[in-house]
Amino acid sequence: MKNPKPFGVVAGFVRLHKSSLGQARYYSIPNDVSIPASKRKFIPSSGTYPKGFLVACAHAGVKESNTQFPDVALICSETPCSAAAVFTTNKFQAAPVQVSKQVLEKRQGAGIRGVVINSGCANAVTGKGGLEHAKMMSAKVDECNGTPSTGPQDTSTLVMSTGVIGQRLPIKKILDAIPTAHSNLASTHSTWLATARAICTTDTFPKLLSRPFTLPSSPNRQYCLAGMTKGAGMIHPNMATLLGILCTDVPISPSALKALLTHAVSRSFNAISIDGDTSTNDTIALLANGAAGGEAITTTSSPDYAAMQTILTSFAQSLAQLVVRDGEGATKFIMVRVCNSPSHADAKVIASTIARSPLVKTALYGKDANWGRILCAIGYAQGIAEGTVVPERTSVSFRPVDGSAELKLLVNGERKAWNESRREDLADEDLEIVLIWCRQKGEKGLGGGGGVVLVCDFSHEYVTINGDYRT
């Protein structure tokens, strides 16, 4: 990429005014300030990236206020690859979601060349014109790859958009920017990082990870997995509210790739929540080009598949954690853990209900051990098996991550007295809420299920950010 700008100095669309509530937060990518000091530790200083994948970004000016910084991104494979994706469950699915689904269905997950993303406009609820714009973006990348499509239904590039809903894309600007980005395709760490930054909206830092690994069939062959994601608000499980692109140079068939992604997403991106809202655009895509060679993964019963499933799931969980750590206005990263539930499904529903409770989240922001709000959320959880929640067997505690003693709030349905000096434990950036159902002696019906959901707190600044989003 030619002279990429430092990612710490990036496009700013709106600046929040400073107030007595604390330091101003910059959203739609920070303006002329560096990434917040507390977030810099999450930005990798180097990376190992999969063979055969090239990335780049360019400025289009999707938002008129953005006069110079990248807002169009490309992730391209030098050869056709297998691809799979998981999409938003929102019924108002954005044009890029619909087009990407069509591309994958028509090609049956094979022969995909990459992904094009724009930030600044979601291209959602934009009618037939929005669909045409998404198809034009896909076709333009194919043209740049030297494999022009024969028609709008024959493209090989997935499309993603993020930003304000209900507005049309400035499509000419984007189509002009795509060749510029394509001419700068590269595989350097700085280019991957700049591309991860180009897809951001309210994020305060680019979310990028990479990981080398081996597989049982080729213990001496190095494979790589890289991924970038964006999201800081409108985040809730069920493939809700974020974009993510994962790439690997392992040879994997489309059917095996889909199974791998579905498993990984259910335990990562579908197990996080920031504000309980589900977006119109969210997509997680996984591309595998096989450029590193070796034995192809074609079935779900092979040792390589099992190893890849573990690696991919762990990797996706790490990416998902970055999204929660960058929650809009967040001051805390919270793990809600449910233990001894009759089933994993029930445990996940209960953990998710706690995670999306505004009262629980505001109490955590205020460093208030208000376990009554946690119990309230447990009590109204929907869709769980009868008898799952037994008040007199319910225990709730806070578990500091620094290894200090667990703060027990409720034990077998009885309030547990605790020292107010432990209140300082609630000021920690990381905290775990543990919910346990106690099994009676000799009983075999409980203890089989557990679930974890990641969430952040609600602060004054979340309201400020979203109240000012379009102003």
Swiss-Prot record:
Subcellular location field: Mitochondrion matrix
Residues flagged as site, Involved in the stabilization of negative charge on the oxyanion by the formation of the oxyanion hole: 162-163
EC code: 2.3.1.35, 2.3.1.1
Record function comment: Catalyzes two activities which are involved in the cyclic version of arginine biosynthesis: the synthesis of acetylglutamate from glutamate and acetyl-CoA, and of ornithine by transacetylation between acetylornithine and glutamate.
Source species: Ajellomyces capsulatus (strain NAm1 / WU24) (Darling's disease fungus)
Additional remark text: This protein may be expected to contain an N-terminal transit peptide but none has been predicted.
Keyword Transmembrane helix in annotation: no
Post-translational modification: The alpha and beta chains are autoproteolytically processed from a single precursor protein within the mitochondrion.
Stored SUPFAM superfamilies: DmpA/ArgJ-like
Keywords in alphabetical order: Acyltransferase, Amino-acid biosynthesis, Arginine biosynthesis, Autocatalytic cleavage, Mitochondrion, Multifunctional enzyme, Transferase
Zinc is among the record's keywords: no
Residues reported in the UniProt entry to bind substrate: 201, 230, 241, 328, 466, 471
Cellular compartments per GO CC: mitochondrial matrix
Enzyme class, spelled out: transferase
GO MF annotations, alphabetized: glutamate N-acetyltransferase activity; L-glutamate N-acetyltransferase activity
UniProt xrefs under Pfam families: ArgJ
Segments crossing the lipid bilayer: none
Site feature: Cleavage: 240-241
Catalysis: reaction(s): N(2)-acetyl-L-ornithine + L-glutamate = N-acetyl-L-glutamate + L-ornithine; L-glutamate + acetyl-CoA = N-acetyl-L-glutamate + CoA + H(+)
Pathway entry: Amino-acid biosynthesis; L-arginine biosynthesis; L-ornithine and N-acetyl-L-glutamate from L-glutamate and N(2)-acetyl-L-ornithine (cyclic): step 1/1; Amino-acid biosynthesis; L-arginine biosynthesis; N(2)-acetyl-L-ornithine from L-glutamate: step 1/4
Active site, UniProt feature: 241 (nucleophile)
Superkingdom assignment: Eukaryota
Subunit organization: Heterodimer of an alpha and a beta chain.
Protein name: Arginine biosynthesis bifunctional protein ArgJ, mitochondrial
Family affiliation: Belongs to the ArgJ family.
